[in-house]
Regions:
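Conserved N-terminal segment of class I S-adenosyl-L-methionine
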Residues: 6-9, 14-27, 38-181, 191, ...
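S-adenosyl-L-methionine-dependent methyltransferase catalytic module, highlighting the catalytic core
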Residues: 187-189, 198-207, 216-297
C-alpha cells in the first residue's frame, strides 16, 4: 500500500479496527508512518495506542473490565435486583446452564470430553461460569475449575454455582501455571479469551503447562471476515478501550496450531447482527472458530 495515499491507508486501518483487529490496524498505520510521516498517521496511531493501555499491566486490565461491568450494571437498573433474586432461588443458574448446553461451541466441547474422558478440567476465562456449570451439571464425575480475570464475574459465578464439582477463582489465563501444579488437567478450554490477551503465546504456554501430556486444549475465538462496500467512518471503541485487540483467520490458526497433535478446527456460523456495524460492511464469514489439539507426550 502506498503510504503517500493517506486516505486509502486510513480506510484500511479503519477496516481492521471494525474487525476488532486493533494490533493489525496499528501495524498498518505505523508501517505507513515510517514511509511517509504524515501527521494524520501520528494522530491515529496515538489514539489506537490509547485503546490498548489497559494491557500495560494486570491491574490496568482488571480495572478496565470492572469499569465496563460497573457501567453495565448502572444501565441495567432494577433488572440487576431481579437478577440477584433469581440467583438466590437458583432460577438463573438453571437458565444459564440450559442455554450454554445448547450452544454449538459447547457441543464441540462435549465431543472433546467424549474423546478425552477427563477427570479434571480447567476453564481458563470462565466469565459468569455458564460453560463450567453446564459441563459440571452434565458430567457429575468431573472436577471443573474456573479461572476468571474479572472479580465481579468470579463473584457472580460463585453465587450462581449449585454444583459441588465446580469451583471458581479470580485470576488470569496467562498465569494458570501459578495456580495449579504442572500436568493437573486432562482437558483445558478457553472460550472467547485469546482475542483479549496481550500475548497469545504466553497464554498458551501457561495453559499447556497445567495440561497433562496427551491432554487436550480447546479454544474458541471470533470469526470476523467482512467486506467493505462503501466508505468506512471513523472508529471509537464502545467501552473506551479495545476489549478485543486481535482477530484470527483460518489460515493463521492452521499455521500456528495445525502442526500440533490431533489438530481440529471447526467453523461455527453465527448470526449477523444488522445495525451492530455501519452499513458499509457486510459479512463474508461470521461466527467463531473452535480449535483443539493434544499436548505432546501422551
Amino acid at each position: 500500500m502506498d503510504p503517500h495515499d493517506v486516505d486509502a491507508v486510513i480506510q484500511s486501518a479503519r477496516f481492521e479496527l471494525y474487525r476488532e483487529n486493533i494490533y493489525g490496524a496499528l501495524e498498518i498505520i505505523e508501517t505507513a508512518q515510517a514511509g511517509h510521516p504524515d501527521p494524520r498517521y501520528a494522530e491515529l496511531a496515538t489514539r489506537i495506542r490509547s485503546w490498548l493501555t489497559h494491557l500495560d499491566s494486570r491491574e490496568a486490565y482488571v480495572a478496565a473490565q470492572e469499569e465496563q461491568y460497573r457501567r453495565l450494571r448502572w444501565r441495567m437498573g432494577l433488572k440487576l435486583l431481579e437478577k440477584r433474586i433469581r440467583m438466590l432461588i437458583g432460577r438463573k443458574t438453571r437458565k444459564l446452564v440450559d442455554r450454554r448446553a445448547r450452544d454449538p461451541e459447547f457441543q464441540e466441547l462435549e465431543r472433546e470430553v467424549d474423546r478425552v474422558r477427563p477427570r479434571r478440567v480447567l476453564d481458563a476465562g470462565s466469565g459468569e461460569g455458564g460453560v463450567a456449570m453446564a459441563l459440571g451439571a452434565r458430567h457429575p464425575d468431573l472436577r471443573v475449575e474456573g479461572v476468571e480475570v474479572s472479580p465481579t464475574n468470579a463473584k457472580i459465578a460463585r453465587q450462581l454455582n449449585r454444583f459441588g464439582n465446580v469451583g471458581f477463582r479470580q485470576g488470569f489465563a496467562e498465569e494458570v501455571h501459578l495456580y495449579f501444579p504442572a500436568g493437573s488437567f486432562d482437558l483445558v478450554y478457553s472460550f472467547a479469551v485469546l482475542e483479549h490477551v496481550r500475548d497469545v503465546a504466553e497464554t498458551v504456554r501457561s495453559i499447556e503447562t497445567v495440561l497433562r501430556p496427551g491432554g487436550r486444549f480447546a479454544f474458541v475465538v471470533p470469526m470476523h471476515e467482512l467486506r467493505a462496500i462503501g466508505p468506512i467512518p471513523d472508529y471509537t471503541p464502545i467501552h473506551g478501550y479495545a476489549d478485543h485487540c486481535r482477530v484470527f483467520t483460518e489460515k493463521e490458526l492452521r499455521q500456528t496450531f495445525g502442526p500440533r497433535k490431533d489438530f481440529r478446527l471447526v467453523k461455527v456460523p453465527g448470526a449477523w447482527k444488522h445495525g451492530e456495524l455501519p452499513a458499509c460492511f457486510e459479512p463474508i464469514e461470521f461466527g467463531s472458530f473452535f480449535v483443539s489439539y493434544a499436548k505432546d507426550g501422551g
